[in-house]
């Protein structure tokens, strides 16, 4: 059965764009139903279950042909699905809430791709920032989103600090370079599954602090979204998509090296080339976060959504 949740959003422009028809040659002879999936970014470890299911033929087994699209703007996973220009988007729980509450955009989540948070406050080892208290007097870089501002403010308050005890600096997409060049002491918005292993691969020691261990309510990071209309009209197709995706998850869990191999086959080498060592660590991290006790892969908790809606209201991220 299709589980739907929906009440969410950095709308900064990026240079991402394009699409990839990733169906195999054997699918040409079959009568397959196309499903367009808009990613949050170029292919990376977060998408391993999707690409594994494609390469292993699980979608074809469900009568589906997957067309992966890369976003031209960072919120395309929501804007394109809500407008009926794509079937499914790969995006973030908080952005779904924001889209519904602040912009009245009719999108819903149909499944949790990564149950646990991956967004962390990170710093290089030589800064010796290991607790929120260590942020006093420090500069924290972020991508300009209201959500990450709320994360930092909540963490500071939870540690007994004032908002102005640390300085927030908008560094755009330069989360890693802003730290390595010394522009800031720490950043919020980077992923434990991407920026952390990437920096470690460059030879840096990385410390990170989890927002959900410092005042921010537990939340689901990555979800599959669609329009409310599509969820109602095409429940069977969406259910088949999720069923095949779960097969991909189970296969990667049993064969992580093969999962990495299938991901690397689908990398966008021109715009976002992947490093095997980094993605191996990334996939291992994603596997450890994709589900948790009482919350198997793809399942959704109404309590988790409700708690985060309340927190977003309390912090002013949403207004209704």
What residues fall within each predicted segment?
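Short, glycine-/small- and polar/acidic-enriched structural segments
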Residues: 15-170, 181, 185-193, 209
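Helix N-cap/coil-helix junction residues
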Residues: 58, 64, 161, 204, ...
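Stable alpha-helical elements in mature extracytoplasmic
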Residues: 46, 55, 74-77, 92-95, ...
């Amino acid at each position: 059965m299709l589980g739907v949740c929906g009440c969410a959003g950095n709308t900064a422009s990026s240079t991402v764009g394009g699409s990839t028809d990733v169906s195999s040659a054997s699918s040409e002879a079959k009568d397959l139903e196309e499903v367009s999936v808009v990613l949050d970014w170029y292919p990376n470890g977060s998408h391993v279950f999707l690409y594994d299911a494609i390469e292993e033929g699980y979608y074809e087994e469900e009568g589906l042909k997957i067309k992966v699209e890369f976003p031209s703007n960072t919120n395309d996973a929501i804007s394109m699905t809500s407008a009926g220009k794509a079937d499914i988007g790969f995006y973030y729980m908080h952005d779904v809430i924001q889209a519904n509450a602040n912009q009245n955009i009719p999108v819903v989540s149909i499944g949790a791709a990564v149950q646990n948070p991956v967004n962390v406050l990170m710093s290089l080892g030589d800064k010796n920032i290991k607790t929120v208290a260590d942020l006093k007097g420090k500069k924290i870089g972020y991508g300009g989103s209201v959500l990450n501002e709320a994360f930092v403010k909540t963490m500071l308050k939870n540690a007994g600090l004032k908002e102005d005890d640390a300085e927030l600096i908008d560094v755009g997409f330069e989360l890693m370079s802003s730290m390595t060049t010394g522009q800031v002491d720490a950043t919020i918005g980077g992923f434990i599954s991407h920026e952390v292993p990437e920096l470690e691969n460059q030879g840096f020691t990385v410390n990170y602090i989890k927002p959900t261990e410092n005042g921010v309510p537990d939340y689901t990071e990555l979800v599959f979204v669609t329009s409310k209309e599509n969820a109602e009209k095409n429940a069977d197709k969406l259910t088949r998509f999720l069923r095949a995706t779960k097969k991909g998850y189970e296969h990667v869990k049993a064969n992580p090296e093969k999962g990495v191999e299938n991901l690397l086959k689908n990398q966008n080498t021109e715009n976002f080339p992947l490093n095997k060592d980094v993605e191996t660590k990334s996939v291992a991290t994603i596997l450890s976060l994709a589900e948790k006790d009482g919350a198997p892969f793809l399942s959704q908790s109404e309590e988790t959504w409700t708690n985060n809606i309340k927190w977003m209201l309390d912090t002013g991220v949403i207004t209704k």
